[in-house]
């Protein structure tokens, strides 16, 4: 049932609009195996701000990533049950084991751009747009080791629609955990910038 006998575990701060990166081994109630993993999480469902502003976020920070897959239009009850980073990671694990999400991404690389307006995933020539995620519809972002032993990390987004009636999960592969954490950091700065400008 488990890929190479490994399971993902995470720990994360519940502080809103902050990134938490911790390394620790956690025992699982699903079995005796555990491994160390580093998880960065961004909870955006908040009105808190660190007060830091970045006026350069009109321009986009760009990262080369690969697209793994998505689970769209989750029911409200199912979507709301996926609150913490561990909930998202476990849900994605089960979806991969059930064949709803692939373990490996498409070969094609995409450009993930982050700005104060949200996230845009486009083709490397910038002519085609794969996905757009408006900033105000992103509920949580979490990144973690993919568990396949190649040093790659997964970046998962939980989004909602404008009416908050449906939830979706979007999964991308990053070249490293450092790249995934950098994306989380830029997105956190984008939220802080918008929240700061809203208060002024």
From Swiss-Prot:
User: What segment(s) does the record annotate as region Interaction with KRIT1?
Assistant: 136-139
Which UniProt keywords are listed? Answer: Angiogenesis, Biomineralization, Cell adhesion, Cell membrane, Cell projection, Cytoplasm, Cytoskeleton, Differentiation, Membrane, Mitogen, Notch signaling pathway, Nucleus, Phosphoprotein, Transcription, Transcription regulation
Q: Where is this region: Disordered?
A: 1-55
Question: One Pfam family, short name please?
Answer: ICAP-1_inte_bdg
Leader sequence residues: none
Q: Where would I look for the motif Nuclear localization signal in this sequence?
A: 6-7
Q: Which residues carry this modification: Phosphothreonine?
A: 38
- Polar residues: compositionally biased ranges: 34-55
Q: Which residues carry this modification: Phosphoserine?
A: 41
The record's annotation in InterPro entries points to:
Integrin-bd_ICAP-1 (IPR019517), PTB/PI_dom (IPR006020)
Spans of biased composition, class Low complexity? Answer: 11-29
PTM field: Phosphorylation at Thr-38 seems to enhance integrin alpha5beta1-mediated cell adhesion. The degree of phosphorylation is regulated by integrin-dependent cell-matrix interaction.
What segment(s) does the record annotate as region Interaction with ITGB1? 139-141
The protein depicted here goes by the name Integrin beta-1-binding protein 1
Species in which this protein is naturally found? Mus musculus
């Amino acid at each position: 049932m488990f890929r190479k006998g490994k399971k993902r575990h995470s720990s994360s701060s519940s502080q809103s609009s902050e990134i938490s990166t911790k390394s620790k081994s956690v025992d699982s109630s699903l079995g005796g195996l555990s491994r160390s993993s580093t998880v960065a999480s961004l909870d955006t469902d908040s009105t808190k701000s660190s007060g830091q502003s970045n006026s350069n976020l009109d321009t986009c920070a760009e990262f080369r990533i690969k697209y793994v897959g998505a689970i769209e239009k989750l029911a409200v009850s199912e979507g709301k049950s996926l609150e913490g980073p561990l909930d998202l990671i476990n849900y994605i694990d089960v979806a991969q084991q059930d064949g709803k999400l692939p373990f490996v991404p498409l070969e094609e690389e995409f450009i993930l751009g982050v700005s104060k307006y949200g996230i845009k995933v486009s083709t490397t020539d910038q002519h085609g747009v794969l996905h757009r995620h408006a900033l105000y519809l992103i509920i949580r972002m979490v990144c973690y080791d993919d568990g396949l032993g190649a040093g790659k990390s997964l970046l998962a987004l939980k989004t909602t629609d404008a009416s908050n009636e449906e939830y979706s999960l979007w999964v991308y592969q990053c070249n490293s955990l450092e790249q995934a954490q950098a994306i989380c950091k830029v997105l956190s700065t984008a939220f802080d910038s918008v929240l700061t400008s809203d208060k002024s």
